[in-house]
Amino acid sequence: MMKLRILAILFVAFAVATSYAFVAPSSGGSDRAVAMADEPKTDEGQKKDDEKGDKEKEAKEKKKEHSYRTKLDARGRKTPAEASQKKPKYKKWKEVLEDATAQEGLFKIWTKREDVFFELGEDQFDKPYLAILSLSKGIGTRFVLGGLPITDLMFDFHRVEDHVQIRMLNTLFRAPDDPELENAIELSYGNSILAQLPIESENEKDKKILVNMNELFLSDVSDMGYFLQLVLDKPARLDSKKAIYRKVKAYAQNVEVDALLTYSPMDRSGLYLPSVPDNRYMELGVHYSIHMLPSEPMKSRLADDRVGYFLTAYKDFTRDGEEDFFVHYANRWRLEKKDPDADISEPVKPIVFYVDHTVPKKYQRYVKEGIEMWQKAFEAAGFKNAIIAKDAPTPEQDPEYDPEDARYNTIRWIVSDEPSFGAIGPSRVDPRTGEILDADVLIEQSMLTSFRLIYRRFAGPQATLMEVDPILTYLADPEIDPEAARRLELEKKLDARMDLHFGAGFSEGLEFLHLALLARGAMEPGMDVPEQYIGEALRWVVCHEVGHTLGLRHNFKSSVSTPFDKLNDRLVVGEIGMTGSIMDYAAPNVSRDRSRQGFYYSPSVGTWDQWAITWGYTQIPGNKSAQKEAEALGSIAGEAHLKEHAYGTDEDTYPAGAMDTLCAIFDLGDDPLAWAKERIGVCQDIFADGKLEERVVGEGGSYLPLRYAVETLLVQEYLAISRAVKYVGGQFTARPHKGDTGGELPMTPVPAAQQREALQFVIQNAFMPGALVLPPEVMNKLADNKIPDWQNPMFAFGRRFDFPLVDWVAAIHNALLVQLMNPMLIQRVVEAGYKADDPYRLSELFSGLTDAIWYNNMTPSGKTAVMQRNLQRIYLDKLVTMTVKPYTGLPHEAVALARLHLTRLQTRIDQASKQGSLSDEAVAHLLESKSRIERALDAKLQAEY
């Protein structure tokens, strides 16, 4: 160990000694160097040495840095010279488009594997285009059906430095020819940025740029995620990794892009979608049709509230001298005469509809006839061959034909797992002018081939009634019934002209016609409905939906144009139509007198249709302003008072505030009460015939059709009875302008005598013992379907296999009382006391209901006792609610009357419950009712009203 230490000391000493020996010699020799090392230095000398040392140190650091950077260069780092050069702003044009294929058209489109690039020039920025979005592939259920429109919007491309914004343009606020106000509008109202896309490359020669459109086309810009939440009641998220293109096509005036998108529900609990293989992944097709708007905007036509057209509206802030800022244009096609001086001329460009290849061959002729039924109306407006039906071309005839291409107006056939809407006729318009640019009609197969509504067996009678009678949706309290709130939101999303309730009501009408034909022996059990009947119905449906595409709204008042006693006169109906307008929802015409049966559905457009088309499409000579043209058309609109021009639309019919007695769906004739009585009579005749089972089931057949027949008859009875409800608290409305001939007032209360008659009709046919009941021998034969499938699971939770007649009757009773005791109806009854000399008073309504439901049958007995007790409970519920927690808008008089009737009823119940001969069920019902009344009378009001 000692030896190792000695060796270490010697090694260190040797190293120190040799370090002196290897000092670099100066010019003065080694001795001089050693001497300088030992010699003390002056201050100036020390300073020079320090400066020299600093320079040497700096040189070493630079050499070290250079060596380090040289090594980094070998790894791909830029040299200092290269780093000083300006970095390219975009990728090279050729680099981006390597292996890409090009299409020339409205935009030059480059496709490269999964990417789609638009090539944009300076002249394409800040220029409005129209985008039309539709579903090209659905899931076959819940309104998510291929072919349905999604939305349409006006947008532009706006460059902001290194990006391009796709802006949805705000067309709602304008100030024509006023730059200062335009600046103010721009300050106050903005656009919506749909996407902001980075510029991929810029062509050095022509300065055109490339943008990758994936962020737009493969995104949820269609808002289908929210739509799925509405229809499924579950939020859904787009899986962007699974988004692909199915088709990208460029044409001279339009671009068609079809994307396949996968959405995943974020919550699958309780979600049952048998039409989707795996409901974790819902595959939807979204089609984008991008159009150049007309370079010369169509001359707009100012709307007139006396004529029913869809509108394009905006606020014009230059109208500060008018009653409001709104301008309304009627939506119309650009139809111009070849010969402007001729009374009747062919158009320069007719409206052409193609009957798509999806329409079954056997129905195509009826579809064409439905389209061209409008020729009659256009001839009244001065046009010949204005609307033409054509077969869709084959690929050989027109390789570019595509029903999703907005250049083609089509009639298409779609299938769905369950009926949704029946048929729809959406159109797309130029938001600047109201010009209709494109339209399509979609028809659901299930509307014709599956008359009965599949969901009946699962949703129950209450849901069925809400489907066929949309007013029940509007009357439901959204706070109490979230399903009603969801339904209303869905209708807003889909569009008013979508005819959501049409499919249900039309299917019920067809089922009733089918049943009537069976009952009359015109068909054998098990037979398909003869094509002539289906064809008649289909022709009417197509004509109705094409009417929407021409700009026309619903006209639910038009049935009053045809006299009730002429409904089965084929000559009269062939000339003026079954109703004044094909835009009505008409019930099938089934005469109680079989020997006088006329058309089942209208064979012609009506008098209102011809008048409305005349107003909308007549060419006014000269180059008049929109205001001058409106004045010239005033003479046509001034004929609105004529009976054959009666008009009332959705808002006059559906909402709780709809008050026009004559605006209703699925009725016929100018006397609604007479029609309702006849329809009830037809239903009762079918029951009373005694051959219903024989005619419907047949020898060896299943009993299931008998069950469907009973459901159909109950729905038809409800629709007829509810038709009378609109008389109570009703008014006759009109749209006169001051100076119009006819002398109509905007509102006239229904005479009290008619209101009393209507209420008695409701009581007699719905509330009296024996109403809405079935022959006992039929009840045990109403078997349900016992063949399982995905729509008919055998082990559905809570499902009943016997027929729930008690539930059906209770649902009808509740639906009728909801309407009769609606706050707005009650408001009108209260205010009628001021308007009329002999008013129908609110006390009459309450007394009429209380007498019929309670006092005239205090202790129900017999087979219908349970139904009567349910009716009493339902009515009592409504009186209690009015007393304890009245609905918003309920007049004070109604609350006071409800309390009065509860007080009187309490006394009567107390007396009745002491009878000794009552059943336990009757006593229990009376005591429970008495207890509820006592609690209600003792309770404090829970709401301000």
Task: Enumerate the predicted regions with their spans.
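Positively charged n-region of N-terminal signal peptides that target proteins for export
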Residues: 1-6
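Structured segments of extracytoplasmic/periplasmic soluble domains
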Residues: 99, 373, 377-381, 414, ...
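Conserved catalytic-core segments centered on acid/base and nucleophilic motifs
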Residues: 362-381, 531-559
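Signal peptide processing junction and immediate N-terminal pro/mature segment
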Residues: 19-39
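Auxiliary tRNA-acceptor-end handling modules of aminoacyl-tRNA synthetases
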Residues: 34, 47-117, 121-359, 377, ...
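Bacterial N-terminal signal peptides
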Residues: 9-19
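Conserved catalytic/binding loops enriched for acidic/polar residues
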Residues: 520, 528-533, 558-945
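The catalytic-center signature of Zn2+-dependent metalloproteases
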Residues: 391-414, 536-592
